[in-house]
């Protein structure tokens, strides 16, 4: 299994609005709307950072209850396997692909679908994976049961789940790939 991180090449990987103070996050979002109006992040509503932080709190709490190791307040976001839909989100989209075994799996939680709709009070369809956080072993069982959402719902026709989100609650493996990416950008310039 591979985890993919999609991002805009002009800003770089593993940049999370939740890592910023609220006013700075709003400023960055405004800047995205002005400079990259055709990107998916430009379409986010004004309260998206507030909603995202609340969602992260719920995911973090549920993962900790399962014995997950939390080494960051906000996770790094990746998805399980390639998502054709996510690859269209950014004007200059690139991705980093990381084998799941390179992570300490005690620091990785999963939601079947993006965590925002998974934990949204407005999505109430009684599917077993709503409002659920999974460990690696648990998500493998869910994948065995339902498959990968991008294989049966990449267009979102059957609900909000279009991919499996992986939340990485540490920097160790991420820092290694971030350094490698930065070296490749500097070396390629």
Regions found by a protein language model. Give the residues of each.
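Conserved NAD+-utilizing ADP-ribose enzyme module
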Residues: 1-2, 8-42, 72-74, 83-189
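Short N-terminal edge-element motif at the start of the domain
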Residues: 34-70
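Short hydrophobic beta-strand that contains or immediately precedes a catalytic carboxylate
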Residues: 77-79
């Amino acid at each position: 299994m591979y985890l993919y991180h999609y991002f805009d090449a002009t800003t770089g990987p593993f940049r999370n609005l939740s890592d910023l103070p609220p006013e700075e996050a709003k400023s960055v979002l405004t800047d995205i709307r002005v400079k990259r109006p055709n990107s998916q992040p430009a379409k986010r509503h004004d309260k998206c950072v507030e909603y995202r932080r609340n969602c992260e709190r719920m995911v973090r709490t549920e993962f900790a209850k399962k014995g997950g190791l939390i080494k960051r307040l906000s996770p790094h976001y990746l998805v399980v396997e390639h998502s054709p839909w996510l690859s269209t989100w950014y004007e200059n989209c690139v991705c980093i692909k990381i084998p799941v075994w390179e992570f300490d799996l005690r620091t990785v939680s999963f939601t079947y679908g993006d965590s925002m709709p998974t934990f949204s009070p407005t999505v109430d369809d009684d599917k077993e994976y709503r409002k659920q956080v999974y460990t690696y072993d648990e998500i493998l069982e869910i994948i065995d049961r339902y498959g990968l959402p991008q294989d049966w719902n990449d267009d979102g026709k059957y609900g909000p789940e279009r991919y499996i989100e992986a939340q990485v609650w540490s920097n160790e493996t991420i820092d290694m790939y971030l350094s490698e990416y930065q070296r490749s950008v500097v070396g390629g310039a």
